[in-house]
A protein has these predicted regions:
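A short alpha->beta transition loop at the rim of the catalytic pocket in nucleotide-sugar-dependent
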Residues: 10, 32, 39
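Short alpha-helical donor nucleotide-sugar binding micro-motif in glycosyltransferases
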Residues: 1-7
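Aromatic "clamp/platform" in nucleotide-sugar-dependent glycosyltransferases that forms part
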Residues: 17
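Active-site helix-initiating loop/hinge in glycosyltransferases
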Residues: 20-22, 115
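C-terminal alpha-helical cap of glycosyltransferases
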Residues: 95, 116-152
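A charged, aromatic-enriched C-terminal amphipathic alpha-helix characteristic of glycosyltransferases
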Residues: 79-80, 84, 94-125
């Protein structure tokens, strides 16, 4: 991806509120550049705290302007700790060289653990441990219906 690999792009900052898996973050790991992201939601499956900067925060009510069929009354969003964000941005800017190795580690971890082959291995393990046998087709044997004889009209 040209944007991710542009020489002026030094890291990815994602302040996602917890909308899902975080595929753009997973894709970005392959640039081997540092990542600053919220420490909440699906992306923490592949972003490791010792390899990325995961920001603290709290769960807060969603903004009333976004309520719809998906975001309903009582739904929560992750609100990042603004002070931690500011500190992390400054630290990344001042000490960028300290984060380069972590970005490379994160990229290698994602590449080794989040591939099609790894997914097949995990699904196979789950199926082998939980499915005793596959369903088999059996002949259908319905009882013969005894219908009343109807008179012609």
């Amino acid at each position: 991806n040209e944007l991710y690999n542009h020489p002026k792009v030094k890291c990815m900052v994602s302040l996602t509120k917890g909308e899902g898996f975080g595929r753009p973050l997973l894709e970005f790991t392959q640039t081997k550049k540092p990542i600053i992201a919220t420490g909440w939601s699906g992306h923490i499956d592949f972003l490791k705290p010792d390899m990325s900067v995961l920001l603290p925060g709290t769960l807060g009510d969603i903004h009333p302007s976004v309520k719809n069929d998906w975001f309903v009354e009582g739904a929560k969003w992750f609100d990042v700790d603004q002070m931690a964000l500011g500190k992390s941005l400054k630290d990344m800017h001042k000490n960028y060289k300290n984060f380069i190795h972590k970005g490379k580690q994160q990229g290698n971890f994602a590449k080794e653990n989040f591939t099609y082959t790894k997914m097949k291995e995990k699904f196979s393990k789950i199926l082998n441990e939980n499915v005793i046998s596959t369903p088999k087709q059996v002949p259908l044997q319905l009882p013969k219906l005894k219908l009343p004889k109807l008179n012609k009209v």
